[in-house]
Amino acid sequence: MNTKEPHKRVVQGKVISKFAEKSAVILVERKVVHKKYRKIVKKFKKYTIHDQDNQVKVGDFVSAIECKPLSKTKSFTLKEILVVGV
């Protein structure tokens, strides 16, 4: 049989806060076209990610992958650090 892996979202963003052990907040930016004015607008969203080894620092650009909920707000884990100290 052919088993499929569940599709998991991958987000990339900048670490803006390292508030607790094994946790960090990343800011993800996306660009959308405004419905009425047809102008490209930046939209931002914050995600709390799980950092098992405490390796990220504020200013790093990281990639995070969706996982099962780890707490009330954490449902992403650190995948890799793309750029150190942006």
Curated annotation (Swiss-Prot):
<dbReference type="InterPro" id="IPR000266">
    <property type="entry name" value="Ribosomal_uS17"/>
</dbReference>
<keyword id="KW-0689">Ribosomal protein</keyword>
<comment type="similarity">
    <text>Belongs to the universal ribosomal protein uS17 family.</text>
</comment>
<dbReference type="GO" id="GO:0019843">
    <property type="term" value="F:rRNA binding"/>
</dbReference>
<comment type="subunit">
    <text>Part of the 30S ribosomal subunit.</text>
</comment>
<keyword id="KW-0694">RNA-binding</keyword>
<dbReference type="InterPro" id="IPR019984">
    <property type="entry name" value="Ribosomal_uS17_bact/chlr"/>
</dbReference>
<dbReference type="GO" id="GO:0003735">
    <property type="term" value="F:structural constituent of ribosome"/>
</dbReference>
<keyword id="KW-0687">Ribonucleoprotein</keyword>
<dbReference type="Pfam" id="PF00366">
    <property type="entry name" value="Ribosomal_S17"/>
</dbReference>
<dbReference type="GO" id="GO:0006412">
    <property type="term" value="P:translation"/>
</dbReference>
<comment type="function">
    <text>One of the primary rRNA binding proteins, it binds specifically to the 5'-end of 16S ribosomal RNA.</text>
</comment>
<dbReference type="GO" id="GO:0022627">
    <property type="term" value="C:cytosolic small ribosomal subunit"/>
</dbReference>
<protein>
    <recommendedName>
        <fullName>Small ribosomal subunit protein uS17</fullName>
    </recommendedName>
</protein>
<dbReference type="InterPro" id="IPR019979">
    <property type="entry name" value="Ribosomal_uS17_CS"/>
</dbReference>
<keyword id="KW-0699">rRNA-binding</keyword>
<dbReference type="InterPro" id="IPR012340">
    <property type="entry name" value="NA-bd_OB-fold"/>
</dbReference>
